[in-house]
Amino acid sequence: MSRAKSLRLLALPLGAALLAAGCGGGQAANLQPGDATATSAAATTAPAATAPAAASGPVAPLTGLPTSAAVAARPAIAVRVPLTGGVGLNDADIVYQEYEHATLLKVLAIFQSKDAAEIGPVGGVRPADPSLLPSLHPLYANTGGASGTEGLLEKAAIPQVTSSSAGSAYRSGTGGLMTSTTGVLAAAPRGAKAPPAVLPMAGTGEAFTTSHAGKARTVTITPPGAPAETWTYSAAGRSWLRSGTPGVAVANLILQNVPYKEVLLRDPDRFAQSARVLGRGACTAVSGGTATPCSWYKRSAAAVTGYVDAAGVPLRFTHGPTWVVLLPPGSKLAVG
């Protein structure tokens, strides 16, 4: 295998050139910014997020994996938990990883297809949540937040199962309050619905493929001022394993290049750094033993995020859980 090649990821403004590259078989992904631009149609038309073509029964909307009709129809649950010391992440279908001032924040974990007996310690609302969550219309379990962010969640009609309004869904644990999927569902208001299929999935038995992909066995990301984080591909498990504690395994890894902005929060008053997930930008998608440069776009909080390759073709991901890293400007990425 060739040595890993590093690149500097720069947050791209709306309409800027997007990452693209060609990768030869057996070579580390040669991900260079500005080699090509996604088509305008790809940037304005959301891909159809479909279930696997060969599926003969119900599938989980966020993973594409076979499940029961009852599970497929139940709502998703969103919970912020710390990455270090967090419990329940291996049961999540989607995880969003965000940074603040070079410090890794509590990740936003989305549960739908699996029951998690213990999740936590449960965190509060973050400024990015009103932009991330509406497309999933989940039940949001949280411990509260600044008045402005909570108001935006209410405006987006995101049902909240908070520690103050639904205490029966929580229990005291080491480091804070803990919850569970059954506890949140039992305390949830009526009328919650299942999320849409937010990622197009490859057909049953098919791998993540694109003509722009190259072989990948390790992925190392280094945000400015933060420790490096390495993911390693397990061919036996057909999954990507995150280094460190807790160990997590996912089918898909999306390294999404986004701007960050200082946000003034009220009640309590403080500044917070928040990922800006609306607009478009560059990304790298990793699935199976391959990685490909791509571009992402999200037109509104209610719209799902679309991912297309350098030719503007929607990516079709491997069945299973997905981890999305919201990379700040100046981050470095090495794919080997």
List PLM regions with ranges.
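Bacterial N-terminal signal peptides that target proteins for export
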Residues: 1-11
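Bacterial signal peptide processing site
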Residues: 24-27
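A surface/extracellular/periplasmic glyco- and lipid-processing/surface-interacting theme
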Residues: 34, 55-66, 70-92, 103-110, ...
